[in-house]
Regions:
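Conserved short strand/loop->alpha-helix "switch" segment adjacent to the catalytic nucleotide/phosphoryl-transfer site
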Residues: 40-62, 117-118
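Acidic-residue sensor for enzyme active/binding pockets
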Residues: 37, 63, 145
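Structural signature of the histidine kinase catalytic ATP-binding subdomain
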Residues: 28, 49-52, 76
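STAS-typified acidic loop motif
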Residues: 22-34
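Conserved beta-strand-loop-beta-strand hairpin that lines the nucleotide-binding pocket
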Residues: 2-22, 69-150
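Short alpha-helix lining the ATP-binding pocket of the histidine-kinase-like ATPase
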Residues: 62, 66, 70
């Protein structure tokens, strides 16, 4: 059974950065992914993350946020996605929380199955799992933790 994790989403703070909490609050729109990319760039530069790790981080976290916006928040612009991170000398972890109801993350189609090869979506979680060192879902899937060993 997964642990219940709650983050309060503040609807009055679209697309803002809380540097004390290392958090980014995003509205559910495509341009939020550009804001996320800039935030990840700055974070990785500030903390001297290797270029090899940077690419994996950028793709995996962007996939998670895109899923949160599209599938969790259903592209409802007033719904927010919170992205935060924690860093120590061994790992960099990202936490992505949306306002959706979650999903059955234990019952996903295999994107490498020949029947799914031509399907236009369904690869985000597969990429997240292969580009990071650990992916953990909480709150029935509306909260994801992605860990990168350093």
């Amino acid at each position: 059974m997964s642990t219940l994790i709650q983050l309060k989403i503040n609807p009055t703070m679209p697309n803002t950065v809380d540097s004390v909490l290392n958090s980014l609050f995003l509205s559910s729109e495509t341009k939020s992914l550009l804001i996320l990319e800039k935030w990840i760039n700055e974070l990785c530069e500030t903390h001297s993350i290797s270029s090899e790790k940077y690419g994996n981080i950028l793709i995996a976290v962007t996939e998670a946020v895109n899923n949160a916006i599209t599938h969790g928040n259903l592209n409802v612009i007033d719904k927010k996605t919170i992205v935060s991170y924690a860093l120590n000398d061994k790992a960099l972890s990202f936490f992505i929380k949306d306002e959706g109801n979650g999903f059955d993350f234990n019952n996903l189609p295999d994107p490498t199955d020949p029947a799914n090869i031509e399907t236009p979506d369904g690869r985000g979680i597969f990429l997240m799992r292969h580009l990071s060192d650990d992916v953990t879902f909480h709150n029935e899937g509306s909260f994801v933790e992605i860990l990168f060993d350093l």
